[in-house]
């Protein structure tokens, strides 16, 4: 795992270091859209975050991750649920480094020139999962637009190593869009498909230019549709954030688009800005509205919908999968 210089302030041409991990203002100063800050909204009472506690496994998990040179999206993306998840001994592993080739202004994962892939990472990951005796794991990654296969081969290596050491573990992958490489990536994933295939749409198509520069709404939908055609028995999953400026009607349309493309599982959660340099929160969605989204999801035919302010794509992912009908594997 790399330990690059972390830069948070805007850099001049003279001080710009392409090898540094850029965060916050440094990361977002070069995106093609300008992040306009408005009034900072007060967090409502229903937004509550659980902190890590020394009496739980929080610090044990952090130590194990460092010893095995592993990253988690929980840490890199500043997930508000990290205290609860680490405290219960769960984590979402982030492979292929800690520097993303994209600069999405809602995301706190660092940007920069990625390091070469770590050939030892799949085995280190598999050994860690085996040592922790995890029954369900989520593997995600940074975007790796620099790789000819988008990183799909590395995903497959990780899946294979995990299944060798932990054959009873269910594997969910949260993949990038493999922009321009989707057919190649899906062909590679055919050799060792996951148990759950997740790719997040994140927001309504109207907001893609602002929130997901470099990504395409229809491309993301088609990625999951193509995967489902190849693996009809593997559940597909996607997630949406609310609070970026979308309307309720736009969220409902995204949900319907998901169902029209064969997506089985859904997550919807409240967007929380990682810093004042990121896209601002434009509304806090009331619990009653989340309840409406959940009810509509089941009416549309989703096998499971995890909907609520603090829901994230990987939050209680095992419970989401079980509720959608994904069974635990027998230990061998």
Swiss-Prot record:
It comes from Polaromonas naphthalenivorans (strain CJ2). Gene3D superfamilies: Aldolase class I. It catalyses: [[Fe-S] cluster scaffold protein carrying a second [4Fe-4S](2+) cluster] + N(6)-octanoyl-L-lysyl-[protein] + 2 oxidized [2Fe-2S]-[ferredoxin] + 2 S-adenosyl-L-methionine + 4 H(+) = [[Fe-S] cluster scaffold protein] + N(6)-[(R)-dihydrolipoyl]-L-lysyl-[protein] + 4 Fe(3+) + 2 hydrogen sulfide + 2 5'-deoxyadenosine + 2 L-methionine + 2 reduced [2Fe-2S]-[ferredoxin]. It comes from the Bacteria. Belongs to the radical SAM superfamily. Lipoyl synthase family. Signal peptide: none annotated. [4Fe-4S] cluster 1 binds at residues 74, 79, 85, 314. This is Lipoyl synthase. Its cofactor is [4Fe-4S] cluster. Binds 2 [4Fe-4S] clusters per subunit. One cluster is coordinated with 3 cysteines and an exchangeable S-adenosyl-L-methionine. [4Fe-4S] cluster 2 binds at residues 100, 104, 107. Pathway: Protein modification; protein lipoylation via endogenous pathway; protein N(6)-(lipoyl)lysine from octanoyl-[acyl-carrier-protein]: step 2/2. Disulfide bonds: none annotated. The gene is lipA. Its EC number is 2.8.1.8. One of its GO terms (cellular component) is cytoplasm. The keyword S-adenosyl-L-methionine applies. One of its GO terms (molecular function) is metal ion binding. It is found in: Cytoplasm.
């Amino acid at each position: 795992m790399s330990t690059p210089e972390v830069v948070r302030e805007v850099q001049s041409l003279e001080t710009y270091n392409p090898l540094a991990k850029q965060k916050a203002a440094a990361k977002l100063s070069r995106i093609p859209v300008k992040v306009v800050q408005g009034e900072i909204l007060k967090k409502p009472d229903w937004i509550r975050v659980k902190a890590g506690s020394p009496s739980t496994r929080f610090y044990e998990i952090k130590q194990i991750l460092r010893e095995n040179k592993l990253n988690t999206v929980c840490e890199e993306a500043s997930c508000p649920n990290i205290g609860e998840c680490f405290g219960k001994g769960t984590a979402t592993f982030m492979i292929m480094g800690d520097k993303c080739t994209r600069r999405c202004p809602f995301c706190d994962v660092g940007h920069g020139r990625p390091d070469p892939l770590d050939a030892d990472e799949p085995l280190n990951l598999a050994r860690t999962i085996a040592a922790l005796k995890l029954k369900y794991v989520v593997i995600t990654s940074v975007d790796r637009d620099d790789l000819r296969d988008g990183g799909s081969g590395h995903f497959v290596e990780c899946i294979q190593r995990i299944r060798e050491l932990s054959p009873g573990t269910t594997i969910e992958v949260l993949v990038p869009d493999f922009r321009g490489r989707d057919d190649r990536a899906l062909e590679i994933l055919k050799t060792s498909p996951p148990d759950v295939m997740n790719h997040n749409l994140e927001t309504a198509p109207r907001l893609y230019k602002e929130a997901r520069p470099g990504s395409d709404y229809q491309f993301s939908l088609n990625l999951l549709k193509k995967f489902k055609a190849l693996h009809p028995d593997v559940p597909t999953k996607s997630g949406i954030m609310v609070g970026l400026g979308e309307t309720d009607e736009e969220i409902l349309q995204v949900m319907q688009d998901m169902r029209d493309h064969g997506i089985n599982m859904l997550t919807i959660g409240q967007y929380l800005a990682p810093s004042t340099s990121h896209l601002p929160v434009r509304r806090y969605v009331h619990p009653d509205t989340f309840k409406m989204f959940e009810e509509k999801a089941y009416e549309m035919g989703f096998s499971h919908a995890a909907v609520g302010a603090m829901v994230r794509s990987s939050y209680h992912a095992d419970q989401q999968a079980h509720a959608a009908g994904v069974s635990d594997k027998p230990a061998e």
